[in-house]
Amino acid sequence: MKWVVSILLIFLLNSTESRTMHSNAYGIASALDSFQCSPEMNLVDLATIFFAQFVQEATYKEVSKMVKDVLTVTEKSTGSEQPTGCSENRLSAFLEEICHEEEIPEKYGLSGCCSQNEEERHNCLLARKKDSPASIPPFQVPEPVTSCKAYEENREMFLNRYLYEIARRHPFLYSSTALYLASHYDKIISACCKSENAVECFQSKAATITKELRETSLLNQHVCAVIRNFGPRTLQAITVTTLSQRYSKANFTEIQKLVLDVAHAHEECCRGNVEECVQDGEKLISYVCSQEDILSSSIVECCKLPTVELAQCIIHAENDDKPEGLSPNLNRLLGERDFNQFSSKEKDLFMARFTYEYSRRHTKLAVPVILRVAKGYQEFLEKCSQSENPLECQDKGEEELQKYIQEGQALAKRSCGLFQKLGDYYLQNAFLVAYTKKAPQLTPPELIALTRKMATAAATCCQLSEDKQLACGEQVAGLIIGQLCIRHEESPINPGVGQCCTSSYANRRPCFSSLVVDETYVPPPFSDDKFIFHKDLCQAQGVALQTMKQQFLINLVKQKPQITEEQLEAVIADFSGLLEKCCQGQGQEVCFSEEGPQLISKTRAALGV
């Protein structure tokens, strides 16, 4: 699945150094150091993506004007000797264009950002990005007649408008990904406009690209949040893990080099440096293909594809198998050395080497699980250093680390057991009760959306073979929890959620699993308005009826977060009885008005609220 294999996109180092310093600081040659601008780069499209993502509410006309103005200025400043599309760094010029005329900053509330210096201005504008803002309606694919006419009249403008529409709704989407999706959209429009049934063609194919856009955008947003909140050390561990699993036959030095380069590329993408994001991506893909013999045989076929398909093929390639001949455990990786005698830098390098060795031996494990193993191993080594016989203690490390895998396996088994027993809807309700207790400050729609994702993940992962369920579940849970943490970052939920989100990336999921009830939450005074029942409960069907029932469940738990399972079952049984009684007769509204208050009185007495 995409979210599993595309976790390759999470990488290292919050660095703003030039490429030369990026290379020299680590003593490792970089594939990105030779800056050669691509004459084929479409700067109009890239600038459109930039302005649409940084000024999301700007109209297409306003964005087009900014694009025209800034490219006129930058083309003059670069001179005529350089090929079209060649500039060391247009990012500053793009940022200046947003602020240099008063109309845009004043109209869209950017004056505060624009009053700051260059770096602070950039960070301020980045912080204003909002994924799928409420003020912008969801993108709808235009009906075929209109689309095909516009496409035939001016294909370039049609696709540029598409880039504007998706970029403003998905401000964290990498520019390289946006261009890929636009090329995909181009093929869909071209094919469907020639189809006998254009409407059906548009509906089916547009649904596919919309799903891909949504998933990729969420993944890119997750990566940028990791870079923003956890910094170099955590990201280094994630990167080493991912690349060591992907290219398990590659040596440690090659992995280190690739980590640094990919890190720099992702940093630039997250900063909104649309031009460098694309160029770095192209150079990385070229480098990986030039090293296919060293890295992996699995990318050989990918490297024969055209550029656009090539990148997607490499990103979505499966992890290599564990190399033959590796020692079964890593107990003696330290040899006769005492971990606590290492300097801080030596400890970091050793842990990177341990993570590399462990990951290439466990290519099927989820990245978060290996991160917990590495974190636990470092704590174990530090503990051994305090013992009477450190070397003897260190030899028991492999056995000590099994508990992290076993904890995850037990949770996966328990979750899939519940899914098999309850099915999607009732499993979602179980998640709903649990997360309403953990985060009662979330609104009912937020809780329903969050737990629906969890239930969908269970439905997907639990269909896999048992050996794949853990990795699947951990990866999806990491992304879902990541979205919850982004929500907390924008508007704090409660201290417990904040602690889980910020204390340790590796331990996020176990932290949320162990979180039970928000002890700081004070239930609001009981309100009858939240528990008034009407005949629409009898008329609703499918998802609409399920949502009504779930809202009742949420309001109930919010009123009494300490509600026991037995109390909950009793109230649900009474509620089901009410529906059965009132929905069978003719006077449904009268029945609810008479029986509903009695149910609520009984419930309040039983719960003491």
Curated annotation (Swiss-Prot):
PTM notes: Sulfated.
GO molecular function (one): metal ion binding
Disulphide bonds in the chain: C99-C114, C113-C124, C148-C193, C192-C201, C224-C270, C269-C277, C289-C303, C302-C313, C384-C393, C416-C462, C461-C472, C485-C501, C500-C511, C538-C583, C582-C591
Albumin domain segment(s): 19-210, 211-402, 403-601
Glycosylation sites: N251
Membrane-spanning parts: none
Subunit structure: Dimeric and trimeric forms have been found in addition to the monomeric form.
Protein's name in the database: Alpha-fetoprotein
Organism (species): Equus caballus (Horse)
Organism placement in taxonomy: Eukaryota, Metazoa, Chordata, Craniata, Vertebrata
Encoding gene per record: AFP
